[in-house]
Amino acid sequence: LNGQYRRPTGIVGRIIAGRMAQQHQPENAWTVSLLHVQPSDHILEIGFGPGTTIQRLAMLTSEGHVTGIDYSSTMVSLASRRNARAIKAGRVKLCRGNVVNLPFANHTFDKVLSIHTLYFWQEPLRALAEIQRVLKPGGTLALTILPREKWPGGGTGTEYCIVYSGDDVVKLMLDAGFTSAHVEPCPLPTQFRELSVIGIK
């Protein structure tokens, strides 16, 4: 089952996607708010899952564009149906791919976000360097995670995922070339124990 969270597939993957869409809606909305999205922004979401945050971003970028990349072809299919109208209008583009090899030109995006995916990145430093590459100068990355100290089982992770503290992620971002990075604790009720690390190119 843990492997399904890394790359949801088939019927089980679709069930997990439905659970994710409902369970993570509050922190997804909070993460979007941290980006201070402007109507003309070009935004990338990495690991968009069922596509609910893509849908939210599309509503906020009436003069811009939203791109999503996900490791799971099941999620690409599901999110494409959810966002079919915006895709047809040319305002959203979704594709399957890997964060360590983003198929975008340098300086493409104003903002990038990724929510609950860092744990599954096999090469986090390389991935963050790729994100830094595709961000415009001064662009913002919001990376939302459940930090190690809040992780079930004492923060040891599993064979499928690696867990991090906020400070770990700050260091990774700076090592990847971001000019600054800081931790934003989640202000939502206590059942939401996430934080977001904000990096500026």
Language-model regions, residue ranges each:
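Conserved class I S-adenosyl-L-methionine
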Residues: 140-170
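Conserved alpha-helix/loop element of class I SAM-dependent methyltransferases that forms part
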Residues: 22-41
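Short glycine-dipeptide loop
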Residues: 40, 135-140
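Class I SAM-dependent methyltransferase SAM/SAH-binding core
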Residues: 42-101
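A short SAM/SAH-binding and catalytic strip from SAM-dependent methyltransferases
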Residues: 111-124
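Core SAM-dependent methyltransferase catalytic element
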Residues: 176-179, 185-201
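A short acidic, Gly/Pro-enriched loop at the edge of an enzyme's catalytic core
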Residues: 100-111
